[in-house]
Amino acid sequence: MACNILNFLTGLLSLSSTLPSTYFPSCIKPSNSHVSQNPVRFEVHLTPGRANPTGAGFRDVILVNGTFTGPTLRLSRGDNVEFLVRNHLREDTAVHFHGITQSLSPWADGTPGIAQRPIRPGAAYLYRWRADESGVFFYHAHSRGQLMDGMYGAIVIERGEDEPSPFHMISHEASDWELMREAEREVQTLMISDWSQFSFGEVMGVEREANIDFTCMDAIVVNGAGSEYCLERELLNEYTNPLVKFILSHTDEKEITDKGCVPPLRLFQGNYSLHLDTLPPEAFRKCIPGVGGGANHTVTVHSSNRWAALTFINPGGLYPLKVTIDNHPMHVFAVDGHYIYPQIVDQILVNNGERYSVFVKLDQEVGRYTIRIANDLLGQVLGGFAALSYNGVMDDPPHPKPLMNYAGGSLVKNIRVFDEFNTRPYPPKPPASVADRTHKFMVRKLAQPHGAYEWTMSGIEGLNMTTEDVASPFLFQDPSQIETSELMLTTKKNEWVDLIIEVEGPFAQSHPMHKHGNKAFIVGRGVGFFPWATVEEAEKHLPRGTFNFIDPPYKDTFKTLEGVNNNAWLALRYHANSPGAWLFHCHIQTHLAGGMGVVILDGVDEWPELPEAYAEWNGFEAPV
């Protein structure tokens, strides 16, 4: 039945969270003008709620279909997806599908002000995209730090039978290969994340009031479950990094706080006028032990299967996280969804936005083995736990062998750590040997009069959150009419583009950078300055082996190096084969909100034609 515009708009603004998952109002017709028939449909309701996952107290969260974390989406490669979002929040939102390239659907990337208009309170938005690549990805809010309020969930795209796998490099037994394929089809996802008792809005309020960069969390949660641990002073001092001890010994503080955090001193924050008297005690100092929260997450595996597949996903707001499993090495077979030449390791480091897929051989005695997770940054001693249970048994094994302590310190000699920068894609996938275009970035805090929480990738200015509110998103515009700047860059279709990120010292923090719209190759990295205009010029001056154009890592999230008393740099190379307006940014949520992002207009010479459904109607057909 036809409906007029008034009925259409009224329907969008009054959708009930109790509607069945397959419901489409009669006046909201999914547009099939740019995707094939028989799509796989998902419907999510975003609602405000309260949660107490660690036992330290309830706080405001965003629930996805009534749960924290959101449900897992399971697809097959080649599926056409319709992902309907109904916004019951009191604020704008948008949903990004992290790692999905959106090569034929840049209007479904989920970046307000860049690829779409925000989803207003009470409105609905229909994302349409094709599952062109297989592996594990995740969806999350991409508006004003809502990711830190729990709006995320996993995406598993099953691989096609024609995809070559590297499983023969893990085991020489052909019988194991089919067991591994079956384990991968049944992969269990673990969303490992830092957790704050403050909502993201409260975090930003604390930053502005005290004029600090917020660097202290409360706990680590796994699939929305965890606990806040308050360690004795003796243990805190034992676990404090020697460099941190040395630096604090030259200050009035002398030691880390009861929450395990480095105090927000000017030495670490920078030369800003701090207002530390406005800080709530719970922000950096007061530790509230978890009581009565949800139990730590348990992964159940079955010993008869001989192998289990797990994927660790870090949707967290701040910290890269180390992971070990007692008594079990891990065979890493995919990173950011893409197969690699496997590495057998004891420990992986999962940066914000990354996904690590591992096989675990189920050859131990039946029991419950501890999965240990720890913050990798120097600024806080923080750990968390989950469990790997054989056949649902909850008894501890007779001979547990932990590999790291609560703070991430190694408990064994010669622990095998995953080598991110020697990750080789499988099958081999080399980049172009020479780039057509280079963009350089200087990551630093903005100096006064800007706040201590404001960042830049241009070295001059930050990408303000008000970009989300522009009347016409950049994808909707003629790119020739968009003014370019250090924050607005362009490429032509099918160019090979180098992105060189230099992080300013003297304490060059590691940043997890994410490029929307493409995976990229990590062709080089180093500690020190990068004064050269291009990689080709740098090759003439840097040691042989600094750059890799044969088999470099191929990812969508990239960790810059740390530098002590120095700068650090990272060189990425990607193929600009997906025209559209794409965000390139740090995945630490306070850094992104503080300005650490740029917009790249890829393929301006073959700009995509925007479907009317997205230009005017949030992905739906126009009412008649």
Swiss-Prot record:
State where Cu cation 3 binds.
142, 516, 585
Q: Which cysteines are cross-linked by disulfides?
A: none
- CDD domains named in the record: CuRO_1_Abr2_like, CuRO_2_Abr2_like, CuRO_3_Abr2_like
Q: Where are the annotated glycans?
A: 65, 271, 296, 464
The Plastocyanin-like domain sits at 48-160, 216-373, 474-603
According to UniProt, this protein's pathway is: Secondary metabolite biosynthesis
Gene3D superfamilies, alphabetized? Cupredoxins - blue copper proteins
| Binding residues annotated for Cu cation 2, in chain numbering | 98, 140, 587
Q: What is its induction?
A: Expression is up-regulated during the late stage of P.nodorum wheat leaf infection and is controlled by the cluster specific transporter elcR.
Q: PANTHER family from the xrefs?
A: LACCASE-RELATED (PTHR11709:SF488), MULTI-COPPER OXIDASE (PTHR11709)
Protein name, per record: Multicopper oxidase elcG
Species? Phaeosphaeria nodorum (strain SN15 / ATCC MYA-4574 / FGSC 10173) (Glume blotch fungus)
The beginning of the lineage is:
Eukaryota, Fungi, Dikarya, Ascomycota, Pezizomycotina
Q: Which gene encodes it?
A: elcG
